[in-house]
């Protein structure tokens, strides 16, 4: 149980996919204009990450490894992730058309979100069990959502601030993202090793 808690805390705070591993930067910069949109994207990515983690773990250890098909890992994982994203897209379109509209192109782009594929590959590289991989996926997704929502909140506040002309737009947003990443570095001592 302690091991699972360390995996969870490590994935959320210490090894945050966006702020420490620099995975998933496209949606981080593209969807984080409003907190509501960021939260919706975070929930969609959370669902995809957790389910993809379970599916790719099963695929790896029941199909790819036993039949010595490890060289197909990347393409097989992408196919699983693409299928899940299509399912999420259909669900969001039916249940929340406003959220679907606000996410725009970024919802289908979850398929190519390197955080989702990176998570699946990291699960295998770390040698996690099925339960550990699900906990790692949930922690990674919560960390992704946390970074997305925090950055969206900061961007909303920045719109109200008098920013010098040279820093308006992307420059101040990248500086803010860097400061947020520095803040998350403060969690580095939480998880040993």
Curated annotation (Swiss-Prot):
InterPro entries: Ion_transpt_RnfA/RsxA, NqrDE/RnfAE, NqrDE/RnfAE_oxidrdctase. Its EC number is 7.-.-.-. It is found in: Cell inner membrane. It comes from the Bacteria. GO terms for cellular component: plasma membrane. One of its GO terms (biological process) is electron transport chain. Pfam families: Rnf-Nqr. The keyword Transmembrane applies. The chain crosses the membrane at residues 4-24, 39-59, 72-92, 102-122, 134-154, 171-191. It is a multi-pass membrane protein. Keywords: Cell inner membrane, Cell membrane, Electron transport, Membrane, Translocase, Transmembrane, Transmembrane helix, Transport. The keyword Transmembrane helix applies. The complex is composed of six subunits: RnfA, RnfB, RnfC, RnfD, RnfE and RnfG. Belongs to the NqrDE/RnfAE family. Part of a membrane-bound complex that couples electron transfer with translocation of ions across the membrane. PANTHER family: INTEGRAL MEMBRANE PROTEIN OF SOXR-REDUCING COMPLEX, ION-TRANSLOCATING OXIDOREDUCTASE COMPLEX SUBUNIT A. This is Ion-translocating oxidoreductase complex subunit A.
